[in-house]
Amino acid sequence: MTDSIHGGHPNIIRSCGASESMWTASHALGLYLRVSNIATLTIPTWKAKFKKSSASHFIRTAVVQVMLKQPAMRVGIIGENSKQPRFVALSSVDFSQQVEYAEAPSVDSVARSLEKLLLQPWPNLSKRPGWHVRVFHEPSSADKDVCRLRICLTVHHAIFDGESTARFHTSLIDALNNPDPAVARMMDKSPVVNLTGDCRDYPLTQEELINFTADIFWIASELWNILAPSFLKPFTFQTWAGEPYNPDIQAINIRYLSLNPIVTQAVVKRCREEKTTMTNLLNTLCATSLARRVPLTERQGFVNLTAVSLRPWIPENLHPNKTCMSVCASSHAQDFGPDVLAKIRQAEDATIWELAVKLRQDMKRRTDTMPHNEFSYLLRYAGDWRDIFQARYGKPRRELWTLSNLGSIATPASKGPWELESVLFAQFAPVVSCALAVNAASVEGGDMMVSLVWQDGILETDLVEGVRDDLEMWLLGLGNEGNLGISSSM
């Protein structure tokens, strides 16, 4: 779509910010299409007031109730394949298209469906929103005490970040337990919701919300690290990160593990006792597993990225922006050099905890100085993201994995028959970024689930499945027996 076409659109809200434009470019090039979050909701069977045939309508009504309170769910995007993509206010949303219904007997079957769904581009974004809900029900649930629905939300990353997907599900639970009669009457008439607002309450860009600052020497150093050829940086280690960047995505693979509430709470408690966090423990365990499974040379190491929410740095006078679904996130890179990998390759539990503590200290040093010298500051100099991404095709990647941990998702304060049982957060890293995406989320007092998502052919399936098995074995050991059980002879 050309600038002349989208420039005349009558409902333009604002231009996409630098970070948002990164995701519109990724979508335009087919490099990154959707973020997903699957929530398992339960309701006692005797309280369920709907039959399977009407469940979709019941959920649709609740989704409408959420949408009417969230500007990000009422916008489209124009000019994705240009230098100036923009958000536009939609005049209507057809919920027969946005909320669909399907059968799935298990989380496994939902994950298989999601592998295909994550590769679907968003259709007609100038007239349709960049979100979709697929409601999965268990076909044999009639004889159970609990009716279980799995709500699969997928979103365009320029509109939602991971934290926003969690907010959607908690808002949906609240809407299900506290239905608005006016919304129900509206949905009884037609699945098409007409929108009259202009979305002037749409959240600001993170660059406008947060006062990013930077030192000139830091800027020069970061640009050197990004742009300078490797032969001019002889003291850095060689990175191993799977196959080179390949824009031809043939398939996406998803594997996951689940920890019950007792194990989850035991692991969280132990992390606190060791003065680290679940995020840093997961990064340490990923590094340990990969170091033992990847055939590395003595000069090779890993680099990982950890997602960081920027919402804590939004000023209090802009507080409404903290609760809106939007994009407000960055990441922090951490190196695992050859010396570190050699150590953890032969390490036992004590050494693993030492590294998890060091990662926590490093992360704290970073967040203590934010938003000063934060990578988001550099995005203003990026130019056209499409050119940047295309220039990376076929080149070796730097980062091996990215970790995004949504933490413990609090259930709504208002009580009702609908409850949030678990959440499976799943996104794959952009083609021109990490080879593997590790995503974690838990429900307050409930299960924790960890997904591993990767582009087919970039990493060997056996390698990722081995990492998944290691994480599960070590975390279950920690939760049940009190120790990770990592042996130097593994």
Curated annotation (Swiss-Prot):
<protein>
    <recommendedName>
        <fullName>Probable alcohol acetyltransferase FCK4</fullName>
        <ecNumber>2.3.1.-</ecNumber>
    </recommendedName>
</protein>
<dbReference type="InterPro" id="IPR023213">
    <property type="entry name" value="CAT-like_dom_sf"/>
</dbReference>
<comment type="similarity">
    <text>Belongs to the alcohol acetyltransferase FCK4 family.</text>
</comment>
<dbReference type="InterPro" id="IPR052058">
    <property type="entry name" value="Alcohol_O-acetyltransferase"/>
</dbReference>
<comment type="function">
    <text>Probable alcohol acetyltransferase; part of the gene cluster that mediates the biosynthesis of cytokinins such as fusatin, fusatinic acids or 8-oxofusatin, known for their growth promoting and anti-senescence activities toward host plants. FCK1 is a bifunctional enzyme that performs the first steps in the biosynthesis of Fusarium cytokinins. It first condenses adenosine monophosphate (AMP) with dimethylallyl diphosphate (DMAPP) to yield isoprenyl adenosine monophosphate. It then catalyzes the removal of the phosphoribose to produce isopentenylaldehyde.</text>
</comment>
<dbReference type="GO" id="GO:0008080">
    <property type="term" value="F:N-acetyltransferase activity"/>
</dbReference>
<comment type="pathway">
    <text>Secondary metabolite biosynthesis.</text>
</comment>
<keyword id="KW-0808">Transferase</keyword>
<dbReference type="Pfam" id="PF07247">
    <property type="entry name" value="AATase"/>
</dbReference>
<dbReference type="InterPro" id="IPR010828">
    <property type="entry name" value="Atf2/Sli1-like"/>
</dbReference>
